[in-house]
């Protein structure tokens, strides 16, 4: 049997061509709508959110970019009010754990020897502090609590200390006199008191930043008392710009800026002695205590800003560098190129000078 062939008329062919053309056009439109919807879901329009408040005796300032609350509700993301509640919860937990200003904090109970059981927040701070102490040859030390308290930089009233008093308290100072066994803190001396203030705000900054990232908020900057972490870039592609304060003559002087730095996925923490000090017999005493002597540091380094991958480390190193002084801190940086720093110091002639590590040449600009 032969094969049958069906030939269409010209009119019928024209009709079919129009149908196929319309079908292809409709399919193209549907594909565009589909991908447009997917794109809008994956890359929604971002809105700027700002949060300000008080914690640990200082301020916090947070800026982040996220979808609108309407979009978040539709896509089962955390809304801005839920994000705020989450951050508040973090701040409360940290305050209840390591704050010296909170009489009921777990740290105060440990310092008073009411307990030696540490929670997760205390353990994380202890281990971070221990790491920085080892890294800096003991120039960072959390066991200075009793001395800092006696010098008048903590929550209690100050009294003038004699050399004998300082020497006696130094017996209980030394990070090696503390150790962690499971969840318990073991003190060599019960008189030893812990002070996490030199990393607490950096730790808080990191915890807030990590919380935002867990909630798909990757474009943000967190500042807790000057301890800053900048995540990602702004929606316009610009890096975050952070100001570095010019050291002032006294703690009440109006703030002026020395320079600005551009940051992306890094932290910057500044430590200085020009706003936190006490005066005794006409002499200005720094709030930074040398853990090897028990006395306030005395050198020409006015402030140091440390750039690191996380705020906890940057916070601890900034304190350690203020103890070391400029020259020893620079020696440390020569062997640890993963960290950068900006030094503001006074010369013998009384002039204020600035220096920085070479890696910052392209992202650091002098203030006008």
Which residues does each predicted region cover?
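Mature catalytic core of soluble alpha/beta enzymes
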Residues: 11-25, 35-368
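Hydrophobic helical h-region of N-terminal Sec-dependent signal peptides
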Residues: 28-32
């Amino acid at each position: 049997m032969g094969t049958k062939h069906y030939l269409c008329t010209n009119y019928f062919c024209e009709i079919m061509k129009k149908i196929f053309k319309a079908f292809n056009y409709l399919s193209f439109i549907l594909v565009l709508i589909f991908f447009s919807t997917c794109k809008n879901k994956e890359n929604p329009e971002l809105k700027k959110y700002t949060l300000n408040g008080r914690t640990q005796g200082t301020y916090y300032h947070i800026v982040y970019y996220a979808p609108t609350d309407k979009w978040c509700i539709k896509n089962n993301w955390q809304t801005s009010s839920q994000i705020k509640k989450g951050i508040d919860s973090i701040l409360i937990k940290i305050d209840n754990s390591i704050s010296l200003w909170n009489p009921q904090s777990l740290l105060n109970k440990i310092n008073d020897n009411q307990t030696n059981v540490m929670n997760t927040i205390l353990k994380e701070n202890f281990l971070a502090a221990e790491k920085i102490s080892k890294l800096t040859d003991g120039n960072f030390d959390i066991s200075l609590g009793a001395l800092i308290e006696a010098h008048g930089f903590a929550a209690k009233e100050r009294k003038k200390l004699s050399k004998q008093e300082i020497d006696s308290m130094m017996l209980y100072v030394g990070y090696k006199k503390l150790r962690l066994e499971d969840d318990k803190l073991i003190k060599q001396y019960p008189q030893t008191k812990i002070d996490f203030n030199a990393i607490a705000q950096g730790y808080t900054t990191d915890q807030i930043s990590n919380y935002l990232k867990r909630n798909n908020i990757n474009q943000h900057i967190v500042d807790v008392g000057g301890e800053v972490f900048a995540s990602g870039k702004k929606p316009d592609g610009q890096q975050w710009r952070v100001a570095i304060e010019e050291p002032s003559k006294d703690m009440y002087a109006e703030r002026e800026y020395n320079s600005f730095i551009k940051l992306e996925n890094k932290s910057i923490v500044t430590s200085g002695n020009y706003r936190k000090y006490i005066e005794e017999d006409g002499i200005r005493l720094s709030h930074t205590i040398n853990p090897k002597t028990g006395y306030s540091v005395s050198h020409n380094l006015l402030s140091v800003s440390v750039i690191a991958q996380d705020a906890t480390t940057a916070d601890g190193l900034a304190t350690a560098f203020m103890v070391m002084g400029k020259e020893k801190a620079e020696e440390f940086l020569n062997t640890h190129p993963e960290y950068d720093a900006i030094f503001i110091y006074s010369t013998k002639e009384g002039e204020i000078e600035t220096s920085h590590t070479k890696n910052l040449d392209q992202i650091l600009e002098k203030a006008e």
